[in-house]
Amino acid sequence: MPVLAGINSKVLKNGDSEPSPPPAGIYRIYNMRFCPWAQRALIYASVKNVPSEVINIHLKEKPDWYFSKHYKGQVPALELDEGKKHVIESAHIPEYLDDLFPESRILPSDPYEKVQQKLLLERLAAVAPAFYAAAQAANNPEGRDEKYAALVKAFEDAEKLLTGDFFSGKAKPGFADYLIFPNYQRVFWLSHILPNSPFSSESFPGPNFPKLAKWYRTLDSIPEVAAASQPTEMGVGFFNDYLKGTPNYDYGL
């Protein structure tokens, strides 16, 4: 089976039948095509070339059976061993895959380096709440400047933390790079929509962030990352609907 088979399948929702368990040797990822947290698992599986299939879930009308995969009904969830095992949460699944496939390990095995990558990811993750606040400001001018400023501050902090080509501190992307990329990609999509966006959609994120701009272009051009991503026009279209309160989880299909 190819990596990420079914990534663009239509969502399963309440009333839809539960799919048969994945066969032995196949890793199933429960996903939503535009969710940055689920995309972390997709990118990791893609980079590590894990034979996997993707089942997309409707996050407003979740199937009852899905709560047996993830007790909160969130994505991502990883299902394996013919449905006997489940691993949940966007940072735990990548680490689990590294332990399962150590020959293609991304997260360092050295305890100190491993902790440093996790701590760095926590610092970079400040972009996530700032993104959602700025997104809500798209249709509400009240407090917009403050929300934009908080998002810019998250980018300024990341620019300082990026001391080389990658947040891994090495010659190729690492754990923090792959897991934080989806959040920056969402800001890129949002830059096409926001009134008076503080970021450039042409040379994202813009001239004030030269290191991040190079980093983003590099990550975005990696084939395995692209395979786990939605095209820009799809992301922009989805978020246009999302900001109107009518998200279409099958947008573009």
Swiss-Prot record:
Highest taxon above the source species: Eukaryota
Pfam families: GST_N_3
Signal peptide, first to last residue: none
A molecular function GO annotation: glutathione transferase activity
GO biological process: glutathione metabolic process
Occurrences of domain GST C-terminal (ranges): 110-238
Domain named GST N-terminal: residues: 25-105
Active site per database record: C35
Chemical reaction(s) catalysed: RX + glutathione = an S-substituted glutathione + a halide anion + H(+); L-dehydroascorbate + 2 glutathione = glutathione disulfide + L-ascorbate; methylarsonate + 2 glutathione + H(+) = methylarsonous acid + glutathione disulfide + H2O
Enzyme Commission number(s): 2.5.1.18, 1.8.5.1, 1.20.4.2
Keyword Repeat: no
CDD domains: GST_N_Omega
GO cellular-component term (any): cytoplasm
Record function comment: Exhibits glutathione-dependent thiol transferase activity. Has dehydroascorbate reductase activity and may contribute to the recycling of ascorbic acid. Participates in the biotransformation of inorganic arsenic and reduces monomethylarsonic acid (MMA).
Annotated family: Belongs to the GST superfamily. Omega family.
PANTHER family: GLUTATHIONE S-TRANSFERASE OMEGA-RELATED, PTHR43968
Name this protein carries in UniProt: Probable glutathione transferase omega-2
Organism annotation: Caenorhabditis briggsae
